[in-house]
């Protein structure tokens, strides 16, 4: 809520990009929503960041990523993915974080 309150106090254009797990669409239990939202950040598939006064800052940078396959396999929406798909997702994650680390460290 602090980020929403901070944005509300700004007298300018604001944009908040939120990840909100959907139990029905994602094939997870309702009680797992918060854990899944944290897990997507921990495995590096979603990053927490702010862009303020012309500067981009990563708010949370995991020292080591947790297992992407564990995150993916717990969700029904990804049941069709095989190991090669998961490896492609990991490669995309690594490329994204290499870019972030190179340009926004």
Model features per residue range: what roles?
Residues 20-105:
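Flexible, low-complexity linker and terminal segments
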Residues 1-30:
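ATP/pyrophosphate-binding catalytic subdomain of soluble kinases
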